[in-house]
Amino acid sequence: MSTCGDNSKIFQDIQNFIQDYDLNKDYSVTSSEIYQSFLKKMNGDSLKASQAAGVLCSTVDMDNDGKFSYYEISKYCADQAKKQIEQNAETAALADVEALLLRLDKDKDKKLNKTEFVKFFKEQGYNPYSDPDYVLKIIDLDKDGYVSASELQEWFKQKRLAYARGPIC
């Protein structure tokens, strides 16, 4: 998922896509131009070019007018980025947890006690006037007073998924 600072890169990528595939330079990309571009890139293999163009057009051309608008391309890119984040959320959350436990789990029991959790809480930049006990209760799903690796993993995963569903800017 992109942040506001990344939007200029996304904008540039979309502009480059339009420039690359807009063969007649009319500032729109048609399904025919996509096919012609793919045909060239696929060394004249019309079947592969047709299939690839068909998939792309059916996926990106939301209003089925045979053209790719800037909105359609950017929506497609944003949707793909969200899907990628969702697919990687579990793995990334596990990596986050492993790194966190290596750093904060002083007694190496693969869970954070209250002291360890408060340190994590402060490192995350939470408001110092917030109640770490309250946050601990939210993350501590089994209510045993500790935050286990699996509870941390679920929390990190949910944060990543929420980020993926949020607005680009």
Curated annotation (Swiss-Prot):
Keywords: Calcium, Metal-binding, Repeat. It comes from Dictyostelium discoideum (Social amoeba). Residues 9-44, 60-83, 92-127, 133-162 form the EF-hand domain. GO terms for molecular function: calcium ion binding. SMART domains: EFh (SM00054). GO terms for cellular component: cytosol; extracellular matrix. This is Calcium-binding protein G. Ca(2+) 1 binds at D105, D107, D109, K111, E116. InterPro entries: EF-hand-dom_pair (IPR011992), EF_Hand_1_Ca_BS (IPR018247), EF_hand_dom (IPR002048). Ca(2+) 2 binds at D140, D142, D144, Y146, E151. It comes from the Eukaryota. PROSITE patterns: EF_HAND_1 (PS00018), EF_HAND_2 (PS50222). Pfam families: EF-hand_7.
